[in-house]
Amino acid sequence: QKDRRAPNVFSGDRIRIVFDEHTANKPVISDLVLACQAPVNIIFADTREVGGIVYGHMIVQLPQDERQREKITAWLHANSITFSKEV
């Protein structure tokens, strides 16, 4: 029987995106995907409300394509979104 699973378009590279009082109520991931025309795979997300302010973080897996990964990190920098590479 033929394998019918979709091809894996994601690399092993993952980043942690931090959501603070400036970004928690914005559609950061959808804006990123639309602006960069590159998919991300959400691995984990957690948000909490502290003193009426939402904070959180999300781990996303990046595409295999190096140009797309560079576009994503450039967009995050340009939009002052805090992120770090996950090991």
Q: PLM features: residue spans?
A:
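P-loop NTP-binding/switch modules centered on Walker-like glycine-rich loops
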Residues: 1
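Non-catalytic connector elements of ABC transporters
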Residues: 4-87
